[in-house]
Amino acid sequence: MSENSSTDMYLFKKSLKELKGKRGKGTELISVYVPAGRRLSDISQHLRQELSQSSNIKSKTTMKNVQSAIEVILQRLKLLKEPLEKGVIIFAGMIPRGGPGTEKMEVYVLEPPEPVKTFIYRCDSEFYTESLEDFIQDTEVYGVILVDRNEATIGTVKGKTITVLKKLTSGVPGKFKAGGQSARRLERLIDDAAHQFMVRIGEYSTESFMPILEEKKLRGLLIGGPGNTKNEFAEKDFLHHELKKKIIDTFDLCYTEEFGIRELLEKASDLLRDLDLMKEKNLIQKFFKELIKDDGGLSAYGESQVMRYLEMGAIDTLIVTEDIELTRVTIKCNNCNFKQEINVKTRDLYKFEDEVKTKICKQCSGSMYIEEEKDIIEYLSELCNIHNSDIVVVSTDTEEGSQISKAFKGMAAILRYKI
């Protein structure tokens, strides 16, 4: 099956993180953003003009590096097929690996998750990644209003992130036992204070959610809390009329602070099953239900077991945490073409590259070299594609995702059949 969108987004985020850490020796790193539908011949013409102007650069080393980067990008553009539905983003430049003389040309070609809108050419000491940040933002937002007689919490749920925007307290006094006119007057004052508190909640909600609604990113409003206060707030005209149209439902809750938002999400899970947070939670809970069975059920976990079962085609859904730091390295013999694939911790990759230079082939004692390095999630995604398995990359921001990361080294799976 086709690669899961969570894998695509993970790889995009990983590339962004790597690019943000790259630095050139001088002003010689090139960033090119090609808008969707733009003719590649126009882009190539612009780059050739930049190539010509680069001859004016005073430093010969910088001039040479800039020209090399532009030429690499021109070559990559020739390999692309039009039309580009989303456009393309290309980065190229000489990146130092250590001291002077260790620079190596690096090139990155990214297909953006959303269409590129504006052409950008930038030559700097670092790659221009600011526009990439917009692509990794979740576009759909749920507004949350938790309310009771004494306090309220206004927040958002965006992808996997819960954000508390405002906490309010009413100052409304509690019930009393006194009777007579004084009691009735006090009761009116309390009712008026409660009404004014609702008005404040409505004003802060409008201030918080209308900008999101105007950007067409507000998917809906969830209103919760103990007692009847939430229903009164939802039914009367405390909210802006456009926001009232976005109310999905009201929910009975025990809490009105951040824990109440989590309680609300649990109760609203059927309505929000498309939300990443709930999809991940439900999937991981399904895995744990299999795991706790006496025979382990249809569960697998850990790098060794998961890799073996995936290659057998026995995995239905592979769960990988986004913090897994492994690279799939293929080393090959210079003499007999013997190959070996190894998972290497990404932080140890440079050390492993040095070790390979002294490695001896097991079959003919020839020298070995690195043929390919690939992010482990990209590699696993390709295997899943071959074996018609699903792959889901989960965040460690959730309790369930953190459990997979810590207890199972970031890899778990639900099997198709018992092994």
UniProtKB/Swiss-Prot annotation:
Matching Pfam families: eRF1_1, eRF1_2, eRF1_3
One function term, GO molecular function aspect: translation release factor activity, codon specific
Keywords linked to the UniProt accession: Cytoplasm, Protein biosynthesis
Protein biosynthesis among keywords: yes
Leader peptide range in chain numbering: none
Entry's Gene Ontology cellular component terms: cytoplasm
Subcellular location: Cytoplasm
Major subcellular site: cytoplasm
Family from the record: Belongs to the eukaryotic release factor 1 family.
Function: Directs the termination of nascent peptide synthesis (translation) in response to the termination codons UAA, UAG and UGA.
Oligomer status and interactors: Heterodimer of two subunits, one of which binds GTP.
HAMAP family tied to this protein: Rel_fact_arch_1
Name this protein carries in UniProt: Peptide chain release factor subunit 1
Gene behind the chain: prf1
